[in-house]
C-alpha cells in the first residue's frame, strides 16, 4: 500500500497568533522558539530537563472525535516544535500584561507576595492558569499536584500556595484544625490583636474575580484543521534530524519497517533528555501522535485496554474513574498504579509523557513497569506483518531479546487485567522527596491465595532502582504453597537479600540502603496483605497490632497553611507613608506577567556571538596539548579563546580565568568557543581535544587534605576562659565529630552575562547577573588591562543569588570580555544548569570535631571545637567563611570556657564560595549537635539543656562584643508559647508509644545571628536621588535587587523622607556609572546601608527645598519642585553612608564586629517512617526579632524562604562526588531542593513585638540570612524521632547524626531486623560510586 502524501508545513498558534513554519528543525524545542525566534521571553530557562517548571506553558488541542478541547501544562524545554502541529500554545504573555490587563492568577501571585526574584513566577502562573482552565474551582489536592512540578528557591512556597488556594471553594479560611475552622475565628490570636498585631499581608477583597468566559478562545482554524485533517505525512528535515509524523496506522507501520531503528516519540520526555544531556542524535524520528488507534480506551469485564499514546495524566484520570465505580478487590492493580501516578515526575511531564514511551523505555527506576509486570499485563503490538500480544513480564522488563518488541513493531495498546477476589497488589516507592523525583527504589508486588485461605498460589515481586533493569525476585516463587505468616516472611527476606545484589560501586550508590528498602517494602506488603486477609476472614488470621499497621499509611500530600503576624503601623502614621506596611514587591506584577527583563531576556544584537566553555575532566593534571582545529572548522564557529588570548591578568590568588599548563579541579575552564549560536558553540566544544597527564596528589575530601596538610591560609582561633582547667572540674566529658554536606545555590537564573564592546576607547557595557557589580567591573578591567572607567556594569535584577553571584560573575564576565575583545563582537555567556553547578561551587562542606565538658545537670563548663571546611581549589571567600563560622559558632549559648579553631582545606574541587548565612549554618549546626548530645548524656530534655546554657543577661560574646540577649529570651519564650511546645511534646510521646514503625519528634532551637561584616568599609553605600521638573523621582543606589525586595524598601524610604506617594518614585537599574565603588549586596545589610544612603540623599534634597516649602506651605509637590527649578536649586543629590564601625583583631581574639544581632527561635515537629526513611514536616513555628520592619511582607518572605532553604540544607540537598572529584548532581534531576510538598504542613511566622535598634534605618533589622539556621529545627526533630525509634528497639543512642538527614540516613539509623539482614559494604575492596567530601 502506498504511503500518504507528504507535507512540510507546520501550523500552530501562539497566544492566538498563527505560526507557519516550513521544514521546521526537529532539534528546536518550544522554549528556544519562544525566546529566540518570536521573542517571547516570559517563559524562562531553568534547567533544560523539565524538572524545574520555569518554562511551563499551556498547550491546547481539539479532539475531533470527542469534540472537546483539552488544556494541559507542559515543559517547553522538552517540547519539539515539530510536535505542535494543530496545537495552540499559551504563554505567560498571552494571559495578561501591564499593557492590557493582568489576569487574576498574575494579580494574586503578585499581591499575595508569591514572588521574590521572580524567575520562577511565569512558570508558577502558567501551572495555576492551566489548572483553572480545567478546574475553575480547584481542590487542594489538585493544586498540590499541579505545583509539584514547579521549583522556587526564594519564597518557601507558602505564599504561592496561598495565592493558588484563593481560587479554591474553601479558601475563605485556613484549615488550622480538624474542625476546618480558622484560628482567627476561634479567637486564638485575640491577645495579639489587642496589641495591634496584624495577620493580614494583603487584602483579598481587592482581587478581581476569575471569569472563565474571558479567556483566550481556541482558534477555530485549528478546529477546522482537526476536523478536515488529511492523512498527510508531516515531514520536517533539519540539519541532523528528520521528523516524520504519519497520519494513519498503516503509514506508521510502513515507516517503522523502512526505518526500524528510528525511535517513536510523543512526549519527548526520555528521548529529549538523551539528545540534550547525552548528545545522542537520531537521523530519523517518527512521531505517532496523530494515530487514533494509539489513543483508544476499551473497558471490558476482563480489564482495561489503554492506548499506548495516552499521556500518563490521561491514564491516571481513566484509572480514577474505573476505581470509583468498581469494588476494591477488582481494582488492586489500578489502585497501585494510581498511587505512583500521583507523584511520578511533575504535572508538566505527566501531561505529555506517553504510556507506551514509559513502558518501552524500560528505565530501571520506572515507577509503573514493576506494577504492570506483576499485574499480568499484555502489550498489543503491530507491524506490517500483523498483530501480536507480548507479556509485559520480567523477561520483557529485563530486555531479554526474545521477549521484547522487534525493531519494526509498534506498541499499540496495553491490556491491564482486573484483579481477582483473592489477589492482592501493592506498589511501593521511596524517592529523595515526595514529588517530582525518580524513585531510589520502587516495587510492584502481587500475591494470590487459594480461596478463603492464606495459602499462596502465586507470588510476583519486581523491583526498580536495584540494577540496570527492573529486577524480579524469582526465588520467591519457592514460597508458593506456603502460608502467609511470619515464617514465610523471614524466608522471603533472606531470599530477597540473596537475590538483590548491588556492588559497592553500583551507580547511584546507597547500596546498603537500597537493599534494605527492598526488604522493608516486602514487610510492608506482608502487613498490608495480612490486614486485608484479616478483614476478609477474621477468624483464620491472627490479630495485628495497630501499633504496626500505622506504617501502611503513606504520608498524605497535604496543602500547607499557617499564619503570619507582625506589628501594625501606628494609627497616626500618614497613609502615604508606606514604611512599615506590607507592600507588594516593586516588580511583582512584572514578574507575574513575564515582563520583568533578566539578562538573557535582552534582545540579541546584530553580530552577537554565543559562548560555550570547555572544562577540565581531570581533578589535577598537566595540560600536555590542546587542539582546537576541528572546533574552529565547525559551522558557525568564529573563534576559540584560551589563556594566551588574555591581554591582562589571567587571574589572581590561583583563580585563573582559563587554565594554563595545569588544571586543579574537574570543571575548571580551559577554553571557550564563540559561535553564531549557542547550539553550534556547544557542539564545537566537544571537538576540542585536550591531552592531560595526571598529577599527584589528588585531594578531594577533608580527610585527604588533613593527610596531606593541604590548607588555605593559617589556622584561625578564638578562646575565652580556661578550657583545660574547666575540663578537670566537669562531671562528664564528651568527644565526637559531625559532618555537614555542601549545598548548591540553585538560584533559578543561572550565571548570565552579556559583554558589548562600544567600539572606541576600549569601552564595554556589561550586563550581568551579579551581587557585586563593582567587583565584576574591577575583574574585567584587570583582565583586559584597562582602567575601570572604561567598563560599565549594569544589573537590572538578579534571578536569585544567595551568595553564589558574588565572586563568580566576575570570573565569568572576564572570560566573556576576553572573547568580546578578541572578536570585536558582543558576547552572550549564559551557563546551562549542569555547567553552572559544575563550575561555580557552593556552600562549604564541614567536618566538626568537639570535646565538651559538662555537669550532670546539663550545664556546659567547657568546649574545645575544631572546624574544617572544604574550600576547594582556590581561596575565593573561604577564609572569611571559616572566620564567620568561628565567630558565630557559640550561637545563643554562653559557654564560659570555649576554644574554637578552624582551617580551610585546599582540595581539587571547584572553589566553594559565599552562601546565605556565610558559615553560621555550619558552625551553629555543630554547636546544636553537641548541645543535644549533652542533653542525651544527662538524660535531660534537649530544650532544658538549651535553655540552661543560653545567654540570660547583658554579656560578651566569644569575640568580646557586648550584647543584650533580652530579645533572644523573648523569642524563645514566645516560640514556646506559640507552638504549645510542652503539650505537643506530650502528644508526640503518646504517639510514639502507640506506633512502632512511625515515630514523631519535636525540637525547638534558639538563634543569635550577628549581622554585617568585620570591616567598616564593607558597610559603606551610596545613592543618587534625582527629582524631575514634573515631580517624579528617580532613585539609584548601590544595592542589587536579588528578590529580597531591596528596591521596594528603597522606594518606601524615599517616600517617607520626601513625604510623597510611592507612585512618584521609580528605580531603574543598578550600574557602576551612576553609583560607583559599590559593595557586594549580602550579609543581610543591603537595605540597612543603602537605605541610609537613600535617606541621606533625600534629606539633602528636602533641606534644599525647605525655604520653598516654608514660603508656600499650602502648595503641592509639583509646585515646589517647579519653583526650585526656577530658582536654580539642584534637584539631584548623592547620598552616602560611611558604614558601621566594625573591626576584628584576630591576634587578640576580640572586636566589635557586628552592628547588631538578630534573634529568633523555631519549633518543628516531624514524623518519620522507620521502614523507608521518609519524613513529613508537620508543623513549624518561627518567632523572629525583626525590630520595626520596613516591609513585613518582604521580611516574612525572607524568613520563610531562608527557613525552607535551610530545611533543604539539613534534610534534603545532597551533593554527590565521585572518588575522582567529579560532581554527579548537576541539575534538579539529581539534586533535590525542597518542593511544595516538603514545607511544613502548618507554617507559622511571627515577628516579635518591636524594640528599638538605633543602628539600622528606622530601627529595622536585616533578616535575609538569619532564618537559614532555623531550618535545623527540622533536623533536630528528625534526630529526636530517630532516638525514639532506637530507644524502643533497645539500641544505643546516636549522639551525632550527619547532615543532611536524608531518607537514607534516617532509615539506616533506625536499625532493625531488616537492616541487620543486609551485609555491610566494604569500601576497601573497591571504590564506592560516591564519597562524602567533608
Swiss-Prot record:
The modification Phosphoserine is found at residue 320. [2Fe-2S] cluster 1 binds at residues 47, 52, 55, 77. Residues 236-421 form the FAD-binding PCMH-type domain. One of its GO terms (cellular component) is cytosol. Residues 8-95 form the 2Fe-2S ferredoxin-type domain. Belongs to the xanthine dehydrogenase family. Oxidase with broad substrate specificity, oxidizing aromatic azaheterocycles, such as N1-methylnicotinamide and phthalazine, as well as aldehydes, such as benzaldehyde, retinal and pyridoxal. Plays a key role in the metabolism of xenobiotics and drugs containing aromatic azaheterocyclic substituents. Is probably involved in the regulation of reactive oxygen species homeostasis. Is a prominent source of superoxide generation via the one-electron reduction of molecular oxygen. This is Aldehyde oxidase 3. It comes from Rattus norvegicus (Rat). The lineage of its organism: Eukaryota, Metazoa, Chordata, Craniata, Vertebrata. The gene is Aox3.
